[in-house]
Amino acid sequence: MTMKLRVYLAMAAMLIPALTFAAQKHTPVYICGFATSFNDSTVYFTDIQYMDSTYTDSKTGFLYSRENYSYQLREHMQRNGVANPTCITIFSKKRKDVEKKYAALKKRYATKGRYDVKYLTTSDFAFTPIIPDESEMKDAPKAQKVKKSKNKKK
């Protein structure tokens, strides 16, 4: 019984890396950022920017290295004197989706006058694309399609 279990575990160990491998594919996206510091009441919105040299994960659709886009905004804010900013990045393949999320954030922070809202134009801050290295850009193994043959018995 233990031999069967070992065989199954060995097979699972060989299959899991193949299942988790996903290539990065070139995908243009719309992207914007939001930054705030919980030490004051100022919030910052970037413009919605079109980036044509970005990459997404072929399985999940997530922006490649998406945390680094937030770090870009955070470093920009720190260079401009904002202490401990918390930054988020919103992205989508469709501008309409980004505009919807942008409007929801803007509604939350711009109404009622509780926050000082500042807007960063593209000339103030622009995201820089992050390009994966060659090993991450290789195409993911594609599953072969099995043709269904119609065997008609006469």
What are the functions of these language-model segments?
Residues A22-S70:
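N-terminal secretory signal peptides
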Residues M1-H26:
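Bacterial Sec-dependent N-terminal signal peptides
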Residues S65-L73, D124-F127:
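Low-complexity, flexible helical/coil segments
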